[in-house]
Regions:
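Membrane-interface extramembranous regions
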Residues: 2-140
Length: 140
């Protein structure tokens, strides 16, 4: 019986739901992975130093990214998810600007741009999903 309910759940998902979960999953994996690297990788520490940031900043940023992942994946209030999206946007735009400012190669400039594109898909589909949920709740 449980297998049937799982099948019904997947059958009820729309393309918008799939786009949301795939983009949010990718974004979350990227953020959790980068946070791990911020905590453990000497190369990342050197990169932050090259960008002119103090050593403690990468630890703070790693913690913030992990909190953002929790806010996106856990059943949290809407305002927390909105703040997580906003924080990630600030992080990606700042990373892009910092890499361009120090003359880093395109291989260092491109990842925040790709992450921002994935975030936009996640955010747009999140807003559409919540709007649809509110509309169906009002009809009921």
């Amino acid at each position: 019986m449980e297998l049937l309910s799982i099948i019904m759940l997947y059958a009820a998902m729309t393309a918008r739901d799939y786009a949301y979960w795939i983009s949010t999953g990718l974004l979350s994996l990227m953020m959790a992975g980068s946070a791990y690297m911020y905590f453990t990788s000497p190369a990342i520490a050197a990169s932050f130093e090259n960008l002119g940031f103090p050593g403690y900043f990468r630890i703070e940023l790693g913690i913030a990214k992990l909190l953002g992942v929790v806010a996106l994946l856990a059943p949290t209030p809407r305002f927390l998810k909105e703040w997580a999206y906003f924080g990630f946007i600030v992080s990606f735009v700042s990373a892009f600007i910092a890499h361009v400012a120090v003359g880093d190669p395109i291989s260092d400039i491109l990842p925040p741009v790709v992450a921002l594109a994935i975030l936009i898909v996640s955010y747009v589909t999140y807003r559409k999903r919540t709007a649809a949920q509110h509309a169906s709740a009002e009809r009921a």
